[in-house]
Amino acid sequence: MSMVVAKIDWRQLYNFASRQALLGFCFDGIERLTKEFSEELKQNPMGRDLLMTWMGAAQQIRRQNMKVNAVAGKLYSKFREDGLRCCILKGQGNALMYPNPYSRTPGDIDVWVNASREQITEYAQKHFEIGDDIRFHHLETSFDGVPVELHFFPGIMNNSIYNVRLQKWFRRNADLQCSNVVSLPDGIGEIAIPTTAFNVIYQLTHLYHHFFDEGIGMRQIIDYYHVVCDFYKVYQNSSKITPSLFTIKEGSTSHPDPLTLRGEGGNRPTRCSEPLRSKVGGPSKVSPNCAGWDRRGVSGDTSSVSCSSVSGSSITSVRSASTTDPSASTALVVVQRELKYLGLWKFAGAVMFVLHEVLGLAEEKMIVPVDEKRGRLLLAEILDGGNFGRHFTKYAGFTHQSMGKKYFLKIWRNMHFVRFYPAEALCEPIFRTWHFFWRMKNKK
């Protein structure tokens, strides 16, 4: 490692971090290097101008996180007080998994509201300023100067068969995600975020969709790295479980050992610091078959838990896959079956390759086996496109073209992926064309 530090091209690293929206994250790592490799840094110092520029960017990211955290907490409280159950997707919930939650570059606030499209739209028209262009799965607005997306459902897939399955999976899991309340850093407020078991599948669908849309960047990959590591902590502690047993264990946390933020002088906010509950309308209803085996109450030896011990109706662990196989008693097996059922298995293998090659994810933490062929393709797209494909040089730089040119360039790009992901790649232009006319029809 010392040889690597001594040869770092700081300007090149800065440019890479900027393209991938990782300036705060990388600067946090540089601060660690100054403590662990001070002698090597004396031999290869960063220029003062670059250091000050980078430090300023990191401080700005920190302030942005504080702003977005405050608005997210306020927005969540507003929905809760108005009787709507919701959770905050990705974003600030993901930041809580980072060693320094202020180092992640924030984006907009994605809110999944557990209500019908009509209810959400009517509520948004009364309480927010919204445009006339409403997307199929969300509408866009802002709150206290921060961009907000109100989701009718968390995500979509291009292939209609897999999309129907995905929406059923979302509906089955919605209630528990809106009950998973966590504290934000420095006591600034609290929000509901999805459980780890939900995120390990949901955030993969998010990456998959954006891969065919405009591309994904390293920031999203690092987010998913933390999700996978968090999931590993969950299922290794109690691998034999009953996925339909989701009663709550008081005071349980995803991070049982409090971690101290460097330089913050306080405890790191825990991601599951409170028992699951609905603060509106009494106790939440725990959905059967939901992705919440990371927030369960199990007494005694969990290896002795069986489906027969669950009170009420007999529920299979992977109902969407139509199986009653008792071998699906581990969290990892359940996730793998869901990935296959939702058409995500091959892409998951590609992501595991990137997580291993770039971030050093250990094999025992992987949710599926590595797919090197698809993984190298994914990594090449990430490195060329940068954050959400904004820096593509190939495909005629399609993300910077006019709407008409972009339409055909996207088709051309996705045809490169047909032999790797035929179902999603072939359906992408069909879905995009349908979505265009749907938006025209539903303009307010």
Give short role names for the model-derived ranges:
Residues 2, 43, 155, 177-187, ...:
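Intrinsic disorder/low-complexity segments
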Residues 1-107, 112-237, 329-444:
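Conserved NTP-donor binding/palm subdomain of two-metal-ion nucleotidyltransferases/polymerases, i.e.
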